Amino acid sequence: MGYIATTMSNLLHQTAFLNLTWGNYVMMLVAFVFLYLAIKHDFEPLLLVPIAFGMLLVNIYPEIISDITVDILGVEHAGGLMHYFYILDEAAILPSLIFMGVGAMTDFGPLIANPISFVMGAAAQAGIYVAYFLAIAFGFNGKAAAAISIIGGADGPTSIFLAGKLGQTTLMGPIAVAAYSYMSLVPIIQPPIMKLFTSEKDRKIKMEQLRPVTQLEKILFPIIITVVVCMLLPTTAPLVGMLMLGNLFRECGVVRQLTETASNAMMYIVVILLGTSVGASTSAEAFLNVDTLKIVVLGLVAFCFGTFGGVLLGQLMKILTKGKINPLIGSAGVSAVPMAARVSQKVGAQADPTNFLLMHAMGPNVAGVIGTAVAAGTFMAIYGV
């Protein structure tokens, strides 16, 4: 009987029930909420499902992301499964591969046809710099503030990339979760701001059809952008270079297999690895603290200011072009592709169902992807990374 009792006691102590804290249960509840939003309400399911499941796993079994250890005899013990996934985040491998996949799926035609979209895409990065100074005011050091501020660009991979490059790995989980959460909430956060700073007359403005873009222009675009941006800011090469390489695969027309692989199989594999590893970085000990709350608030402020900056410049462009530009497309300058462009289309269609703004909004939207990468490169240059 003693043996059986001891065995049962040992088994009981090996279960998660006796080893988890209240914080773990809170994080498990957050994971369930994310899964509900992703599955029931279709809030960015490709991102939220793996993130939520990684969050669930690490709070049931924290050792799944444990580091490699060496015992007193010098014997090395392997780390947890998610530790090896997470190394790919810290080394900026997964974010860069995500950018390649995004490039392979993106049509830069609307941006080429309307180069002024570059300016609106840049204006929507205002939230990044507002958040940077606010984060410093909140007590974060410069590198942490820079990593947090990228949330304002609504760009998860760039947030992870910069946090890793600046050595802010302890903040990577909260930053990534905040960035992806706000990306999924674009249709909820942006419309009130867009409507507040535009009149119904503004929202009804119809824009002229974009000019056709030649194949040669589409081929030259990624090459020129790579040379110009990477010469000015070499630190952007991993992100901008991979983004433009993926786009060159798409547009050159001679590497169909590479285009299909980059935009489908590789992209989804990387999303699984990135999502689960980011989710697994949100253990209760790492996530439930005051810094996380600050990051969530700063991220929301940054995102709102980014939307405001885009709409404000859209209003300026409307005045300069004598009413030829609908200011709603400015809000699409955040790099949540293509969600932000769809929101511009939806808000415009609410004012006038015959108004079709999607392709016009895609210009600032894809410009925002480049703009966020440039902002990250600027911070890396400032801090000598």
Residue ranges: model-predicted function:
Residues 32, 110-132, 283-310, 361-365:
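Entry/N-cap segments of selected transmembrane alpha helices
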